[in-house]
Amino acid sequence: MLEPSRYQDPRTWKMTPAMIRARRPYIRGNLFGLVTLLGVAGGIYVYTYRALHKDDDFADVPIPPVSEEELRQLRQEYELHKKQRAAER
């Protein structure tokens, strides 16, 4: 079992007034560090999310013409692939 520290109440495991007084000077710095760390991590997350989720409609990319024969062949390949995947499940 864990031994309680001198700075903890042995019955409730709460910090004693001495421990609270000892930690008081560091509260502001620790909170500043926490806010800075969360801000940087959140900023990176938001930047990445916005960079990856741009509205790309690919309007400037030319689409090559597809003949009816090629389209029919692609549809057959797609249907065959779908059947194979369904059989695997």
Swiss-Prot record:
GO terms for biological process: mitochondrial cytochrome c oxidase assembly. Its main location: mitochondrion. The keyword Transit peptide does not apply. Residues 1-28 are mitochondrial matrix. It is a single-pass membrane protein. InterPro entries: Coa3, Coa3_cc. The chain crosses the membrane at residues 29-51. Disulfide bonds: none annotated. The keyword Membrane applies. Pfam families: Coa3_cc (PF09813). Residues 52-89 are mitochondrial intermembrane. It is found in: Mitochondrion inner membrane. GO terms for cellular component: mitochondrial inner membrane. Keywords: Membrane, Mitochondrion, Mitochondrion inner membrane, Transmembrane, Transmembrane helix. Belongs to the COA3 family. Component of 250-400 kDa complexes called cytochrome oxidase assembly intermediates or COA complexes. Required for assembly of cytochrome c oxidase (complex IV). PANTHER family: CYTOCHROME C OXIDASE ASSEMBLY FACTOR 3 HOMOLOG, MITOCHONDRIAL, CYTOCHROME C OXIDASE ASSEMBLY FACTOR 3, MITOCHONDRIAL. This is Cytochrome c oxidase assembly factor 3, mitochondrial. It comes from Eremothecium gossypii (strain ATCC 10895 / CBS 109.51 / FGSC 9923 / NRRL Y-1056) (Yeast).
